[in-house]
């Protein structure tokens, strides 16, 4: 299991590296710079700063310089925030992380729990009115974009006298009661989509599980529908749906881009959008690392949970050939091919298996299969009519080294 988790973690790191590399080249391909000038004096200063920050260097040079600095693990490893070099990127981003995590994680938690509940209810009532009603809602919430739902909820907020704007943690007039009221609309905007995805998946899994023989056996033993659903249907429906949690978290972060702009949430997504427009490369890269890193780490954690609850993965993983074994096999095969490439009609003699010559070699105890050699004296080679130029003996599908010994 440990090897399996390490493998998934390694794949996550590779995926993150590829994503960040693509983003780096896309952002720098725009040609924008994060510095601007309003006078002739400013132009000279800006040009000097561009030279200092390395913007005049080729993009490939800046790319390798970025990774070298990132892996230096120094205080400024994340790079410079060009708009305000006195403030570090970490300070700016982490000041807004609580707002993003609050909206995203709370909406994901509520959406997943609501989706699991509605999926169970819909699946257990397959073909009934309740199932049809839930399916209609699922189709609506999947089809309608989150920003359209958000605009509709803004109208609803005005009708219910709810705050239309989100109250951030660092607001000057922050109060807990107003904060909770202002959180309802942004969170609901993300809840509907995530709950719809969970509902659809869980409902299909429940329908499939209910057709299994062990469910019919449980019912025939006299178990009620609630007990069957609790002990048999729920667990066997959740296990195949575990990977959906990864997509749910990623979807919540993706939806957060629009929700933060729509409801005034001072989060990480707002920084990313602003930074892309002015080519704040270091800020963009760190935001991508943060926004994509959490779903990737969540995917590794969920893979770990998946291995614990589903023994089939452990069995499949234990039956796989390890990378070290594959490398050993390739190395031995390469050596075998190199040996056969050295063999030709001039330096090898073919001996048929179970032939008289083969039996004579056995009687002389000349064949050593362990060391893959045939050891003969010069007189024995002459008596057996073995060529004096032969260095190898081909016996069946084996290639044995011919050695001359002094008897």
Curated annotation (Swiss-Prot):
InterPro entries reported in the protein's UniProt record:
BPD_transp_1_N (IPR045621), MetI-like (IPR000515), MetI-like_sf (IPR035906)
What are the entry keywords?
Cell membrane, Membrane, Peptide transport, Protein transport, Transmembrane, Transmembrane helix, Transport
Q: Report the CDD domains cross-referenced here.
A: TM_PBP2
Gene Ontology terms describing biological process: peptide transport; protein transport
In its UniProt entry, the species of origin is given as: Mycoplasma genitalium (strain ATCC 33530 / DSM 19775 / NCTC 10195 / G37) (Mycoplasmoides genitalium)
Q: What is this protein called?
A: Oligopeptide transport system permease protein OppB
What does the UniProt entry say about where the protein is found?
A: Cell membrane
UniProt lists the gene as: oppB
Highest rank taxon of the organism = Bacteria
Q: Where is the ABC transmembrane type-1 domain?
A: 97-307
Q: What is its main location?
A: membrane
